[in-house]
Amino acid sequence: MSVVGIDLGFQSCYVAVARAGGIETIANEYSDRCTPACISFGPKNRSIGAAAKSQVISNAKNTVQGFKRFHGRAFSDPFVEAEKSNLAYDVVQLPTGLTGIKVTYMEEERNFTTEQVTAMLLSKLKETAESVLKKPVVDCVVSVPCFYTDAERRSVMDATQIAGLNCLRLMNETTAVALAYGIYKQDLPALEEKPRNVVFVDMGHSAYQVSVCAFNRGKLKVLATAFDTTLGGRKFDEVLVNHFCEEFGKKYKLDIKSKIRALLRLSQECEKLKKLMSANASDLPLSIECFMNDVDVSGTMNRGKFLEMCNDLLARVEPPLRSVLEQTKLKKEDIYAVEIVGGATRIPAVKEKISKFFGKELSTTLNADEAVTRGCALQCAILSPAFKVREFSITDVVPYPISLRWNSPAEEGSSDCEVFSKNHAAPFSKVLTFYRKEPFTLEAYYSSPQDLPYPDPAIAQFSVQKVTPQSDGSSSKVKVKVRVNVHGIFSVSSASLVEVHKSEENEEPMETDQNAKEEEKMQVDQEEPHVEEQQQQTPAENKAESEEMETSQAGSKDKKMDQPPQAKKAKVKTSTVDLPIENQLLWQIDREMLNLYIENEGKMIMQDKLEKERNDAKNAVEEYVYEMRDKLSGEYEKFVSEDDRNSFTLKLEDTENWLYEDGEDQPKQVYVDKLAELKNLGQPIKIRFQESEERPKLFEELGKQIQQYMKIISSFKNKEDQYDHLDAADMTKVEKSTNEAMEWMNNKLNLQNKQSLTMDPVVKSKEIEAKIKELTSICSPIISKPKPKVEPPKEEQKNAEQNGPVDGQGDNPGPQAAEQGTDAAVPSDSDKKLPEMDID
């Protein structure tokens, strides 16, 4: 079973796998561990990753990048409106109201959802992992920013399904970094001791995230998170781009922003310049040849000037740092370490700001680029039954407070209640109790819209169906289980109605006989963090079982709280009935549409595969043309007649011209047939060359064999001791076979020497190999027959043993005899060691 962690970044992606030796970040087909988050659409296929990155400028309108933040967002979203101006491709409104991406693919205009585009990237990363692991990849853990809302998280989950992946967990990027940091630490405080507080700062290409985590041995608890969703490396790039657009506009009279290709080229150069300035404080040049209207442009920049231009951005570094300390009520002295990751943290001014705020040196023990994917792979290994991993519990937080709203007839309006506060532990479940006579609807929403980086605070509506009053007309008790799962997604996971069955005896009043106003109140059962933490550590296969356990425990606790003392005296029976729940999720893709996207992705993967095979077949023809044309005037020259060489060379030239004209775009089979046609002419020449190389070596080997056997035959005839045990008839057979082989070899050599090199050889290498094998199989068993061993006679030893007792020496041995007996009874040291030596 494969264990894979995927860091799905804004600009680039990483894939890590868990193996017996630990966690390994794997490389793609370009031997690069970083895969650009880029997809280019062409007339025949899609290019994904590094291949697409090279087409950003040449195929700008159909090359998609920077789409990560479109997940779960409507086309009218202010964020989408702001992003559109920076994109080379078209962003359109889909029939559902969501943001779509418009490109030309397979010679026709196509609109793709953000989920489809992300699924394409995930399919590529999946293929990369499978090529390294040599087995299918299904289970994975995918990273998302900690500030993602429900709609965005569900959108990413849909993308994983389209790509054919089973996402065991959507993991917050800062939590993944914390796991990668903590699981290997051997010096963490014990569970009963004060935890170690570590701040993790992650500034990537598009966003800035901060979290505070408390570590104990085998335990990680996220205390709080803070973020700036738009502060990242690209903002610093934009400062440089805007500066040079203005400078080149004045200096060269160019309107750079009117030409998207020119703007993309400038963006690439500015990103390189920014990275150079991180390591160099001196003036650095920026030069671009034939930049726009055949004009070469150049400029300079240094770190000091760049930092002055970025003052507004640098001022945004501190607020999230201050926010996490305020949320956790920690002092700077309570922080053990500040660990930084993400590409933008390499900017010296950013590091200086963070270090100055905490008043301590920053820690860089983690790989700034790969920490997230390594943490995801570790989480996948923890969830997978295929790996035995050190026990390590992970408790995350809810980034925004979540509330429920419902209609309350008794109060003639709506009521609401906050079920999960900000920084509440997650994953987590709660059981709520309602008293209702009819179906009702719960509306989930984020209760602090001002803190939300998303325009719509609504999460979903959950309608609890088939609610009926009790037999006496009173309100029924309805238990609703709400939870934030391991993906950070809120849901009403179940609802049940408690039916009361009364006996015929007079009973004391039940809890259900409350006044109408009290019936409308909601009761929240006590929380169970321990159950959730246990569920967190169980393998993915046991999730359902854990949830059942959690529900039953919550139910029993609820009964204890709700059941009044009078009920013990009354003879009352209760039963629960599961109620159906209808979900209306914000921007959720329906199952039918999701299946269609899965089918379309499969078709596109197959089209890419067919196009690759077609290109490989075409390249094979081109490669053969160049190879044979070169060798015909080189090493193959002696093995082909002048007329044949001229005609074959002409054929190769015609094929080359055909490849760039009529044969430029042909089906795969046409190229396969063309290659076979060329090989019919070229293969005989190649074989003649190979035979001329191998034949002398094999004849030499055969000659050595014959000489060896002739020497042995001569030694046998001279009756040398070494061979005097061999049978004469067998040696006659050896002599006959050797003479026949010599005659065959001489005959073939003479014929071959008379044969022209431009003609097929008289004898082929395989025939010589067969003759060597035949001669060896006949002669070798005979001449290698071992000499029979001659054992010394044992009669004298037996007589010596019998004579001793007969002479009477056995009863009264003298001193000498006694000594001899002792020697015989106790063997010497050398005698003792012999068996060991023999064994060795």
UniProtKB/Swiss-Prot annotation:
The modification Phosphotyrosine is found at Y89, Y336, Y660. It comes from the Eukaryota. Signal peptide: none annotated. The keyword Oxidoreductase does not apply. The keyword Acetylation applies. Coiled coil: none annotated. The modification N6-acetyllysine is found at K53, K430, K679. GO terms for biological process: chaperone-mediated protein complex assembly; protein insertion into mitochondrial outer membrane. GO terms for cellular component: cytosol; extracellular exosome; mitochondrion; nucleus. InterPro entries: ATPase_NBD, Heat_shock_70_CS, HSP70_C_sf, HSP70_peptide-bd_sf, Hsp_70_fam, HSPA4_NBD. The modification Phosphoserine is found at S76, S393, S415, S546, S647, S756. The modification N6-methyllysine is found at K773. One of its GO terms (molecular function) is ATP-dependent protein folding chaperone. Its main location: cytoplasm. It is found in: Cytoplasm. Residues 514-533, 788-799, 829-840 have a biased composition (Basic and acidic residues). Residues 500-575, 783-840 are annotated as: Disordered. The modification Phosphothreonine is found at T538. Keywords: Acetylation, ATP-binding, Cytoplasm, Methylation, Nucleotide-binding, Phosphoprotein, Stress response. Belongs to the heat shock protein 70 family. Interacts with TJP1/ZO-1. This is Heat shock 70 kDa protein 4.
